[in-house]
Swiss-Prot record:
Gene3D superfamilies: 3.10.20.30, 3.30.54.20, Anticodon-binding domain, Bira Bifunctional Protein, Domain 2, Threonyl-trna Synthetase, Chain A, domain 2. It is found in: Cytoplasm. The keyword tRNA processing does not apply. It comes from Finegoldia magna (strain ATCC 29328 / DSM 20472 / WAL 2508). It is an enzyme of class 6 (ligase). The gene is thrS. Binds 1 zinc ion per subunit. This is Threonine--tRNA ligase.
Length: 634
């Protein structure tokens, strides 16, 4: 007899081994129809799997994140089965679920083109009608190697060879398709009612550019067609908002062949970045941070001491100076630590808060680069708080408030995630337990709901991550608050305690925007290029109705520039209707039409972006309104 505790606090007892499906049915047949999997003691499992001892079980539906993982993982196998039928001899690499759907990496002589995706979808529909059951099979490593060698599945063999000799290997069968897979999966495919194969890309085996380039097919699936239609509508809207397209149209930035992954910011783009930094610097000053600047290149021994050499070397760039090895910094924290250590500190000074808008470089594979979202160099809005252990919770709470203030200025809602200890970590169990409980306490005292993301913390400590929701419902991980007891130990950081002894400070790493470049890309898509006045590269465009009013238009421009506004004049000999339309296409916040009537009455005829004609206004009063809107970041 064993006990199963359920999410609602109730419990059920069972005599012997039982499938999760049968546990679900014992609660409700309706629940069993809707469920796609279960979380058992924190681990996602398929309904076909069994339990035989005391545990906590939460059944999940497609709407749950864990449910989507199961649904999309099975959809990946469904696609692979269709490909096996259509293109015999295909070698299958890996096919996981991802944040938005699934993919499978494939090795085949057939070069996939977009037209093939429709053919594969049609075959997937046939398989769904056949509704083959998924069967979970456990075999020995030796049997698995023999099976996949005989089938010529070299990539599966490569994966299996990395398992221990005595490992039990899990396979999943779907009709004639058999895959090496830990699961979990759906019971069958009948509920995969709507799907779309989205794109074809290239991917190196194991992400190593020295290995063979494979073909990757991405897809998405849902239990209802309505959900697929809504998703495709959002995708279409996302295409219109693509920051690479808008960035080019608005003259914000470019990526040149001479520097893949290294963005070039144009004058309009620098306006946006400068306004972002100005906003941040004002808030840093108000909240008691000092600003620092540390070198881009630092001696290799620093990165050994910090642990980055052991945990991050593959993402770093290196150089030699005077015969010694140096690294281009991938993170700002070691520099901040050296600044702290340059002076002796008393407990009375703590907390000490230092911020750096520091440029970092991180190696990314060329195939992973994507506009401003994935680059090789970026400015990180880092700050480090050195404090007493008893100050941790208060300082984390203040940092949460700081993040909330910044995000609300852009209209972002957000969700919070607490990431715990990864396998590749530094430090004792006691340090990690204290760090995690400190972050939990801060979140709970703020009343913020949060999810636990097991094993996704930094190698030196747990972290709180902020996931922002943009205007079309996509989420972006931006801000992070990380607690670190390891760096103070490694760098022998101290302060003088009240009793005169030397003690270790706690260290909080935090970033709010994260990468400035990535955050700018998010803002471009969030606003679809229609920035609020304070961020707009061109806030006002003056449109004289004929050439004879150009001189007055330039006088007005100078008057507005003197008040700090960004203003352009369209002095072309074109019809005013054309000028208005083109001004709207340029996403200018305000277009001012100037003619004799406006000059005689000291007025401007105002058109506001997305609203249109808002009538005539007194010129001086309108300028005052704009200055107020700009300075107060409305």
């Amino acid at each position: 007899m064993f006990e199963v505790k359920l999410k609602d606090g109730s419990a059920k007892e069972f005599d012997g081994e039982i499938s999760l499906l049968d546990v679900c049915k014992s609660i409700s047949e309706g629940l069993a129809r809707d469920c796609v999997g279960a979380v058992v003691d924190g681990k996602i499992m398929g309904l076909m799997e069994t339990i035989d001892s005391d545990c906590e079980v939460q059944f999940v539906k497609f709407d749950d994140d864990e449910g989507k993982q199961v649904f999309w993982h099975t959809s990946s196998h469904l696609m692979a089965y269709a490909i096996q039928r259509l293109y015999p001899g295909t070698k299958f690499a890996i096919g996981p679920s991802i944040d938005s759907g699934f993919y499978y990496d494939l090795d085949t002589d057939h070069k996939f083109v977009p037209e093939d995706l429709e053919k594969i979808e049609a075959e997937m529909k046939k398989i769904v009608k056949e509704n083959p059951k998924l069967v979970r099979v456990e075999i020995s490593r030796k049997e698995a190697l023999e099976r996949f060698k005989n089938e010529g599945q070299d990539y599966k063999v490569d994966l299996i060879e990395n398992f221990d000799e005595d490992a039990t290997i899990t396979l999943y069968e779907m009709g004639d398709f058999v895959d090496l897979c830990r699961g979990p999966h759906l019971l069958d495919v009948k509920n995969i009612k709507a799907f779309k194969l989205l794109s074809i890309a290239g991917a190196y085996w194991r992400g190593d550019e020295n290995n063979k380039m494979l073909q990757r097919i991405y897809g998405i699936s849902f239990p209802k067609k309505k959900l697929l239609d809504e998703y495709l509508d959002r995708m279409e809207e996302a295409k219109k908002r693509d920051h690479r397209k808008i960035g080019k149209e608005m003259g914000l930035f470019s990526i040149q062949e001479e520097g893949p992954g290294f963005p070039f910011f144009h004058p309009n783009g620098m306006v946006v970045l400068n306004e972002l930094e100005k906003f941040l610097k004002e808030q840093l000053l108000e909240r008691g941070y000092g600003q620092i600047k540390t070198p881009l290149i630092l001696n290799e021994h620093l990165w050994h001491q910090s642990g980055h050499w052991d945990h991050y070397k593959e993402n770093m760039y290196f150089t030699k100076i005077d015969g010694e090895d140096y690294a281009i910094k991938p993170m700002n924290c070691p520099g901040s630590i050296l600044v702290y250590k340059d002076e002796l500190h008393s407990y009375r000074e703590l907390p000490i808060k230092v911020a750096e808008l520091g440029q970092v470089h991180r190696h990314e594979l060329s195939g992973a680069l994507h506009g401003l979202f994935r680059v090789r160099t970026f400015v990180q809005d880092d700050a480090h708080v050195f404090c007493l252990p008893e100050q941790i919770e208060e300082e984390v709470s203040k940092t949460i408030d700081f993040c909330d203030y910044i995000y609300s200025k852009f209209g972002f809602k957000y969700e919070v995630e607490l990431s715990t200890r990864p396998e590749d970590s530094m430090g004792s169990d006691e340090d990690w337990d204290l760090a995690i409980s400190s972050l939990k306490n801060a979140l709970e005292h703020k009343g913020l709901p949060y999810k636990i993301n097991e094993g996704d913390g930094a190698f030196y400590g747990p972290k709180i991550d902020f996931h922002l929701e943009d205007a079309i419902g996509r989420t972006w991980q931006c801000g992070t608050i990380q607690l670190d007891f390891q760096m103070p130990e490694r760098f022998d950081m101290t302060y003088i305690a009240s009793d005169g002894s030397k003690k270790r400070p706690a260290m909080i790493h935090r970033a709010i925007l994260g990468s400035e470049e990535r955050f700018m890309g998010i803002l471009i898509e969030h606003y679809a290029g229609k920035f609020p006045l304070w961020l707009s590269p061109v806030q006002v465009e003056i449109l004289p109705i004929s050439d004879k009013f150009n001189d007055y238009a330039y006088e007005l421009q100078q008057k507005m520039k003197a008040r700090g506004l960004r203003v352009k004049v369209d002095d072309r000999s074109e019809k005013i209707g054309l000028k208005i339309r083109e001004s709207q296409l340029k996403k200018v916040n305000y277009s001012l039409i100037i003619g004799q009537n406006e000059i005689d009455n000291n007025e401007v005829s105002v058109r506001k972006r997305d609203i249109g004609d808002v009538g005539s206004k007194n010129t001086d009063e309108f300028i005052n309104e704009l200055v107020d809107e700009y300075q107060n970041r409305k």
